[in-house]
């Protein structure tokens, strides 16, 4: 018998992730603050729950994919939240990019209630979510990770166990740090190509397969050139992630000048009204 999965948060990525689980035959209970966002998956057979509490009482596995650490805190620790209402033995998987310290707090609270918690942030954007090819980095108890592997495999391809609670979130910070300065490089390269009189699309054919090649160059540079700034990943969420990484680095006594520069440029972009655009909209700082 298939486990009942509860999915909280049906944004740009969450909706696709939940759909893969539903398509595998699992009963899927859903909750999101704006019910309209759930309409398409409800039409496919997902079951709407009016509150986090109602969902938590019925699900064997509860997956959260919300916006900010404050949202995670509310969903897990509110009086009508997951920790207070999940049934004994349930698996709690937070796939939001959030604070490692919060992941540890959730794991400790879950253990006291005979629940199993994993922090499992993802990378791959809307494309990875739609195709079920996300990279999933997981922290928590190894046995819980292994028990949830069949669920993870419905949403992603590169699924790696990283260590105890908080390790998934720390790994995601490494991911975001690597992307941050890289996105600036991609935008500058495309702006340079255009300014020099080259055909940027043709330039991409040469440089995507060489040493400069990256996911961002292959997937987001074409969107820049097309003027497609729809969010596969929101600017505002990327700024949040970079802020968490800088906070964690400071706690470890580590300086991150490249990350600091990238965040300052994205802050400038957001101040121009682009916080709800995709991260590729950084290109607008160079090309109007």
Swiss-Prot record:
Organism domain of life: Bacteria
EC number: 1.1.-.-
One Pfam family matching this protein: NAD_binding_2
Transmembrane segments annotated in the record for this chain: none
Signal peptide boundaries: none
Keyword Oxidoreductase: yes
PROSITE patterns from the UniProt entry: 3_HYDROXYISOBUT_DH (PS00895)
Enzyme class, spelled out: oxidoreductase
UniProt keyword terms in alphabetical order: Cell membrane, Membrane, NAD, Oxidoreductase
Main location: membrane
GO cellular component, one term: membrane raft
Compartments in which it is found: Cell membrane; Membrane raft
Residues holding NAD(+): 6-20, 97, 240
PANTHER family found in the cross-reference section: 3-HYDROXYISOBUTYRATE DEHYDROGENASE-LIKE 1, MITOCHONDRIAL-RELATED
Name of this chain's protein: Uncharacterized oxidoreductase YkwC
Lineage: Bacteria, Bacillati, Bacillota, Bacilli, Bacillales
């Amino acid at each position: 018998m298939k486990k009942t999965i509860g999915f909280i948060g049906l944004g740009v990525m969450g909706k696709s992730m939940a759909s893969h689980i539903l398509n595998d035959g699992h009963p899927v209970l859903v909750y999101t603050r704006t019910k309209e966002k759930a309409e398409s998956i409800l039409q496919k057979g997902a079951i709407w729950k009016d509150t986090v509490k109602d969902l938590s009482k019925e699900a064997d596995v509860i997956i959260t994919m919300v916006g900010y650490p404050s949202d995670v805190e509310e969903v897990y620790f509110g009086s009508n939240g997951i920790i207070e209402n999940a049934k004994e033995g349930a698996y709690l998987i937070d796939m939001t990019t959030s604070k490692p310290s919060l992941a540890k707090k959730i794991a400790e609270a879950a253990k006291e209630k005979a629940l199993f918690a994993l922090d499992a942030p993802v990378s791959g954007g809307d494309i990875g979510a739609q195709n079920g090819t996300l990279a999933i980095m997981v922290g928590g108890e190894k046995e819980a990770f292994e028990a949830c592997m069949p669920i993870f495999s419905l949403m992603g391809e590169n699924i790696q166990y990283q260590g105890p609670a908080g390790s998934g979130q720390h790994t995601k910070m490494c991911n975001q740090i690597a992307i941050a300065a890289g996105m600036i490089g991609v935008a500058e390269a495309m702006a340079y190509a255009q300014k020099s009189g080259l055909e940027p699309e043709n330039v991409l054919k040469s440089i995507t397969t060489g040493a400069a090649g990256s996911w961002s160059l292959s997937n987001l540079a074409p969107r820049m050139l097309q003027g497609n700034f729809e969010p596969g990943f929101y600017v505002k969420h990327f700024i949040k992630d970079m802020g968490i990484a800088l906070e964690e680095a400071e706690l470890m006594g580590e300086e991150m000048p490249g990350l600091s520069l990238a965040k300052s440029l994205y802050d400038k972009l957001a101040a121009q009204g682009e916080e709800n655009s995709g991260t590729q909209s950084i290109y607008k700082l160079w090309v109007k």
